[in-house]
Curated annotation (Swiss-Prot):
It comes from Drosophila melanogaster. It holds the Pfam family Fuz_longin_2. GO terms for biological process: establishment or maintenance of cell polarity; non-motile cilium assembly; vesicle-mediated transport. Belongs to the fuzzy family. The keyword DNA-binding does not apply. GO terms for cellular component: cytoplasm; cytoskeleton; plasma membrane. This is Protein fuzzy. Its main location: cytoplasm. It comes from the Eukaryota. It is found in: Cytoplasm; Cytoplasm, Cytoskeleton. The keyword Cytoplasm applies. Expressed in female, but not male. Keywords: Cytoplasm, Cytoskeleton. Plays a role in the organization of cell polarity via a planar cell polarity (PCP) cascade. Involved in the development of the hairs on the wings. Specify the correct orientation of the hair by limiting the site of prehair initiation to the distal vertex of the wing cells. Controls wing cell hair number by maintaining the integrity of the cytoskeletal components that direct hair development.
Length: 416
């Protein structure tokens, strides 16, 4: 997988920053200028160039056939800033679209009303504040290429202690006077208030990237929320409550000082050290320790399409014979991620059909010589994706998927 990210000013085409990820070389300036030139040319004709896909044949020495290298290009123009995203081997165009939205959001967290700025002022402001948003952009790119996180969804941790931790969080929320609070454990959200889940998914993701891209878990910074509040800043405060856990709150300037918020956080979680430690032990797996998953399952994705929550993990409970079938955690996660992209694209196509007799996708599966994948959806918008070893009979995958789906969701203590 390779991704280029080019940020330019719309008026002058001057580069603000350039980022790349994967096995790719730096783009020459002439290529950057050509990509921007395509966008400007179509814009002069009143045509908005949004996306295109190209493929080229790479010759292989002493071999007649050649493998096609397919690239997808995305152009986005917003508030005097042009973003060009180029991706190869990314799985789906939707990933690049989501990536572009998040990058614009990262810039918008610190720079507002960019369209009202003069060209020279805008460029100076973008350069000056780059140290604030570029680390977030790098974290977004890392998440897109690593294949261990779903962009467009909030990464969650399902621990058996979540119900008790949520009670402490609601107590803290009442004391600090904010409806927007969450507890982050190991870079994932364990529990959050209803107000936090009411935030747009993009706002939630960006705040999590802001926290996880920093070298410290303690913050008190003003931020704009691209969807909820693009022109009025909130205070984003994060307070460490354990070695790998932080309490996050969105509040206004009139709310309590950081010292008072810190005191409220310590009061709420003073006697909950054992609960936090138990939740942190779930981090590699993201599931309750006592929950047993069939040893023939290699990896799991669980999402809710309405709340945009997600869980993406590998199964650690496997026999030695199973572990030899597919080597490498990233390889098995990448296989399931590709199946996830294909399935969600199919769901989207079914839902956008103009026919009155729409088809609802409930189950889907795929088989290969080395593994099998299965997806199961319920009426509440929960979808589970499983990667099985190839030895599992195809007719048994539906039963196993439904059983694992029920075992996870019937655990009320995880607060899904």
């Amino acid at each position: 997988m390779s991704i280029y990210l080019l940020c330019l000013t719309t008026n002058g085409g001057l580069p603000v920053f350039t980022r790349k990820k994967g096995e790719c070389e730096n783009l020459p300036f002439s290529t950057v200028a050509s990509l921007n030139g395509f966008h400007m040319f179509f814009k002069s004709l009143g045509i908005q160039l949004e996306a295109t896909t190209t493929s080229k044949q790479q010759p292989i020495q002493n071999q007649a056939p050649a493998d096609a290298e397919e690239w997808t290009y995305i152009w986005r123009d917003r508030e005097s800033i042009t973003l060009i995203v180029c991706g190869c081997g990314v799985g789906s165009e939707q990933l690049l679209q989501t990536l572009a939205d998040l990058v614009f959001g990262a810039i918008g967290m610190f720079i507002t009303r960019a369209a009202e700025m003069a060209h020279a002022t805008l460029l100076d402001r973008l350069k000056k504040d780059a140290k604030k948003y570029v680390p977030i952009v790098d974290a977004i790119l890392e998440a897109a290429c690593a294949g261990t996180q779903l962009l467009g969804y909030t990464d969650c941790l399902l621990a058996a202690e979540n119900a008790q931790l949520l009670q402490c969080l609601n107590e803290f929320s009442g004391h600090c006077g904010s409806l927007f609070c969450c507890l982050v454990v190991g870079h994932r959200i364990a529990v959050a208030t209803e107000g936090w889940w009411d935030l747009d998914t993009r706002d939630r993701e960006l705040l999590l990237f802001l926290l996880n891209s920093s070298s410290t878990m303690q913050h008190d910074v003003p931020v704009y929320l691209p969807v909820k509040s693009p022109h009025i800043a909130y205070r984003f405060v994060s307070i460490p409550v354990a070695s790998n856990s932080a309490l996050c709150v969105l509040c206004g300037a009139e709310n309590a000082s950081f010292r008072e918020l810190h005191a409220h956080a310590m009061s709420a979680y003073r006697n909950e050290g054992n609960l936090l430690a138990a939740a942190e032990r779930c981090v590699p797996r993201s599931l309750p320790e006592h929950l047993e998953i069939d040893g023939n399952v290699l990896a799991i994705i669980l999402i809710n399409r309405h709340t945009r929550k997600s869980l993406f993990t590998r199964n650690l409970n496997q026999s030695a014979s199973v572990k030899r079938i597919i080597v490498g955690d990233l390889q098995r996660l990448d296989i399931l991620k590709k199946f996830f992209d294909q399935t969600m694209d199919a769901v989207h196509q079914f839902e956008t059909q103009s026919s009155s007799n729409k088809t609802t996708l409930v189950d889907q599966y795929s088989c290969s010589d080395y593994h099998k994948c299965y997806a199961h959806m319920d009426e509440l918008g929960n979808v589970i994706f499983l990667l099985f070893v190839a030895a599992v009979p195809s007719h048994a995958m539906r039963f196993l998927a439904q059983r694992i789906h029920a075992n996870i969701l019937q655990e009320k203590s995880v607060c899904w």
